[in-house]
């Protein structure tokens, strides 16, 4: 099963190895005709829960976002539309590269990433316990954080930051897309050995189909 119940919402499992890729995987059937049944983010409520599920916002922030969205449905719908726009553009850039993708796709991702960078603030890093004085040499002193004051845009800004981090990583592993029917999910594939999003869904389905084809071929021989 490639989904699970989270805070009352059906969520796709995070199997990609990076939140930005899991965000792209909130749509299934890339390259296929549009079908609302392939959408994992049918409303803002699901978007907020997904951001929590992916580790991009806290549980408390998620609850605040859901309550606020209930009071400001128009604004919530607008943010959801922007998130879907970013998702489509990010998928194109990740799959084809910045040079191969439509320039408008990269421009869309860049605009969202720049907005997220402008909304971040530098805050002290959580303390790290260490027997030594001053803590480990590689322990960060501070970190970038998005404020809850970002309002309903918080999960959108968080995923844009995650996307920017992935796109600018010098040691980024190879990214592949699942060839399964009605899938196209992305995942990190550092060794190049992974083929499917998960063996329990697309992998097993392909095995069953291949077995059926072999049986039909045997009957015709």
Regions found by a protein language model. Give the residues of each.
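Short helix-coil boundary/hinge micro-motifs
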Residues: 1-177, 220-221
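BZIP DNA-binding basic region
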Residues: 154-211, 216-221
């Amino acid at each position: 099963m490639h989904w699970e119940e989270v805070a009352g919402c059906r969520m796709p499992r995070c199997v990609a190895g990076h939140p930005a890729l899991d965000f792209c995987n909130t749509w299934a059937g890339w390259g296929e005709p549009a079908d609302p049944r392939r959408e994992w983010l049918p409303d803002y409520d699901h978007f907020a829960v997904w951001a929590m599920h992916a580790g991009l916002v806290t549980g408390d922030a998620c609850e605040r976002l859901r309550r606020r969205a209930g009071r400001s449905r128009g604004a919530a719908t607008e943010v959801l539309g922007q998130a879907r726009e970013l998702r489509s553009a990010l998928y194109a850039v990740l799959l084809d590269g910045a040079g191969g993708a439509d320039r408008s796709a990269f421009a869309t991702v860049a605009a969202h990433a720049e907005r997220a960078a402008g909304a971040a603030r530098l805050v002290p890093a959580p303390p790290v316990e260490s027997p030594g004085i001053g803590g480990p040499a590689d322990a960060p002193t501070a970190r970038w954080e998005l404020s809850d004051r970002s309002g309903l845009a918080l999960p959108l800004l968080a995923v844009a930051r995650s996307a920017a981090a992935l796109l600018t990583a010098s040691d980024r592993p190879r990214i592949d897309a699942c060839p399964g029917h009605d899938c196209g999910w992305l995942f990190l594939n550092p060794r190049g050995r992974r083929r499917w999003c998960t063996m329990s869904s697309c992998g097993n389905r392909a095995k069953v189909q291949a077995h059926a084809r072999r049986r039909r071929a045997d009957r015709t021989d």
